[in-house]
Amino acid sequence: MEPLENPFPEPVEIEITDSFDLHSFSPKDIRAVVEAYLAEAHKKGFATVRIIHGKGVGIQREIVRNVLSETDFVRSFKNAPEFSGSWGATIAILDV
């Protein structure tokens, strides 16, 4: 009998930059992914990050902004400028 394929693939490592695109994530994963991203971005010393959630119906934007409002080291957040995603992305200012 052949061994079963591992149902848990190896984790994917993503380089942490000051911009993070959530388009490839399911809404059910957004909270955990954004929390992990913010922790790593803060650890790296980023003062500002851009989280791209898309325009859509606003489900991902709402989740992102809830996480931001609950995160102690987030000073403030707002829509990205028009040239950088507008209301399809959120800019967060972090304590450094």
Regions found by a protein language model. Name each.
Residues 1-96:
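Long, charged, low-complexity intrinsically disordered regions
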